[in-house]
């Protein structure tokens, strides 16, 4: 049986990951405003945002299986979402370079009155970089729409020195976690 769902995200990375495991989907970007409340633990923040996105789309498609997801980076108890612009991306990378940090991704699946949420954390260490290297990476534009200002699946892979945990989680959607959640809705990838 082919798994089919609505993706409450415009993220090209999440689309690529779903395609990679053979999930059929339709993109229905959510109008939900992501919250970046520093008082919330990151595990709670990402699942709340993921659920908010899925529930927002459910208003337009109440009988569908809907996937919402949210990713943040945490370093020294500070939450890093997407940068506000090139200067912010450079600042984030300057703080993260040479350091271990944690990437949290929350997943929400919603179908009619049922919903399930879960999160996954992955530790990542970026290599040490010179200010010129950071500026060149930012100038290429890749980090401008990524939590933490780097794309592990793109040129940013050259910035990653080590990873401890789920690679696809850092990209923006833990595939092993998603497969487990889909099974709870009687949808099997394999």
Swiss-Prot record:
CDD domains: Maf (cd00555). SUPFAM superfamilies: ITPase-like. InterPro entries: ITPase-like_fam, Maf-like. Coiled coil: none annotated. GO terms for biological process: nucleotide metabolic process. Its main location: cytoplasm. It comes from the Bacteria. It is found in: Cytoplasm. GO terms for molecular function: dTTP diphosphatase activity; nucleoside triphosphate diphosphatase activity; UTP diphosphatase activity. Pfam families: Maf. Its EC number is 3.6.1.9. The record marks 13, 71, 153 as: Important for substrate specificity. It catalyses: dTTP + H2O = dTMP + diphosphate + H(+); UTP + H2O = UMP + diphosphate + H(+). PANTHER family: BIFUNCTIONAL DTTP/UTP PYROPHOSPHATASE/METHYLTRANSFERASE PROTEIN-RELATED, BIFUNCTIONAL DTTP_UTP PYROPHOSPHATASE_METHYLTRANSFERASE PROTEIN-RELATED. This is dTTP/UTP pyrophosphatase. The lineage of its organism: Bacteria, Bacillati, Cyanobacteriota, Cyanophyceae, Gloeobacterales.
